[in-house]
């Protein structure tokens, strides 16, 4: 009886009372190693409170944070061919799509919304990096083109938030075709007289950098974002030279004239509203000298 009381019953109770604990409750800062509770990170817009390090922000959270009161119209996801090349590497492409959809609860990497930022109507397009590295494929390209068409028909600006490793290799030449398609969409918006502003986030690389990510009228960037075409390691191996400290970061690109402003995530909605009001010649309250100066330089370039 003692054996049952002292061992079996406590063992059963402990097994029944055990609860599954999610693995991602605590998130480590890549810069300092500090562990941050995930709810604290989410409430701070995915910025590490102590170090100010900007973590990757989910696309849905970014749209909700950008628009006034988190209210916006979600633009529909276009229906396209799934896995047209029947591609397979270490895993079927169709399986990668299924897993990414379960993970992100999105059909593909692009989310787009129409709403207001400080009262100014605009279309926002956001990459979800957790969907196959935010890569540009047929579905993403079509969603981007449709978003530009909607901005053109609504006669409002479009703001792009790229976060991507580049073209989606599992779709081959069909993926690469999205580069000229999105470039034409940018041109059509500009021909209609509407501004196109890009907020470069970490990372923005590959074919996305070679197309619509660097075609904005104004380029903002989040602090510490990696922005470039080829990766640093590939460039160093090709040139057989060590690259400068901070190469391909948003701060480096600002210093060398490739980016107009580096803006902290908390300040992005207000900065965007000021920039767009200046570009559309609407009244703007007390825009600081840095904002006006950056826009003037970009306009004269």
Swiss-Prot record:
Residues 25-294 form the CoA carboxyltransferase N-terminal domain. Its EC number is 2.1.3.15. GO terms for cellular component: acetate CoA-transferase complex. Pfam families: Carboxyl_trans. It comes from the Bacteria. Disulfide bonds: none annotated. One of its GO terms (biological process) is fatty acid biosynthetic process. Pathway: Lipid metabolism; malonyl-CoA biosynthesis; malonyl-CoA from acetyl-CoA: step 1/1. Its main location: cytoplasm. It catalyses: N(6)-carboxybiotinyl-L-lysyl-[protein] + acetyl-CoA = N(6)-biotinyl-L-lysyl-[protein] + malonyl-CoA. GO terms for molecular function: acetyl-CoA carboxylase activity; ATP binding; carboxyl- or carbamoyltransferase activity. It is found in: Cytoplasm. Keywords: ATP-binding, Cytoplasm, Fatty acid biosynthesis, Fatty acid metabolism, Lipid biosynthesis, Lipid metabolism, Nucleotide-binding, Transferase. Acetyl-CoA carboxylase is a heterohexamer composed of biotin carboxyl carrier protein (AccB), biotin carboxylase (AccC) and two subunits each of ACCase subunit alpha (AccA) and ACCase subunit beta (AccD). Component of the acetyl coenzyme A carboxylase (ACC) complex. Biotin carboxylase (BC) catalyzes the carboxylation of biotin on its carrier protein (BCCP) and then the CO(2) group is transferred by the transcarboxylase to acetyl-CoA to form malonyl-CoA. Belongs to the AccD/PCCB family. This is Acetyl-coenzyme A carboxylase carboxyl transferase subunit beta. The lineage of its organism: Bacteria, Pseudomonadati, Pseudomonadota, Alphaproteobacteria, Hyphomicrobiales. The gene is accD.
């Amino acid at each position: 009886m003692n054996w049952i009381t002292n061992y079996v019953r406590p063992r059963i109770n402990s097994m029944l009372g055990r609860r599954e604990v999610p693995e991602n409750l605590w998130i480590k800062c890549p810069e300092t190693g500090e562990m941050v509770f995930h709810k604290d990170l989410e409430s701070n817009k995915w910025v590490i409170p102590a170090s100010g390090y900007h973590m990757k922000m989910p696309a849905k959270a970014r749209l909700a944070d950008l628009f006034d009161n988190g209210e916006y119209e979600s633009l529909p996801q276009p229906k396209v061919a799934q896995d047209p090349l029947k591609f397979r590497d270490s895993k079927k492409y169709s399986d990668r799509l299924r897993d990414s959809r379960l993970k992100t609860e999105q059909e593909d990497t692009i989310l787009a919304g129409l709403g207001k930022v400080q009262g100014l109507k605009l279309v926002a397009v956001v990459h979800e990096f957790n969907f196959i590295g935010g890569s540009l494929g047929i579905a993403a390209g079509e969603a981007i083109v449709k978003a530009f068409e909607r901005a053109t028909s609504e006669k409002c600006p479009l703001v792009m938030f790229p976060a991507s490793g580049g073209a989606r290799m599992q779709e081959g030449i069909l993926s690469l075709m999205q580069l000229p398609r999105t470039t034409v969409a940018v041109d059509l918006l500009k021909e209609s007289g509407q501004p196109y502003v890009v907020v470069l986030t970490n990372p923005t690389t590959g074919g996305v950098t070679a197309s619509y990510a660097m075609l904005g009228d104004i380029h903002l960037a989040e602090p510490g974002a990696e922005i470039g075409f080829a990766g640093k390691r590939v460039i160093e191996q090709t040139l057989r030279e060590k690259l400068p400290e901070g190469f391909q970061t948003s701060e480096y690109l600002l210093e060398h004239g490739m980016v107009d402003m580096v803006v902290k995530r908390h300040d992005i909605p207000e900065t965007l509203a000021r920039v767009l009001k200046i570009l559309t010649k609407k009244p703007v309250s007390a825009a600081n000298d840095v904002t006006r100066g950056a826009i003037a330089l970009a306009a004269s370039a």
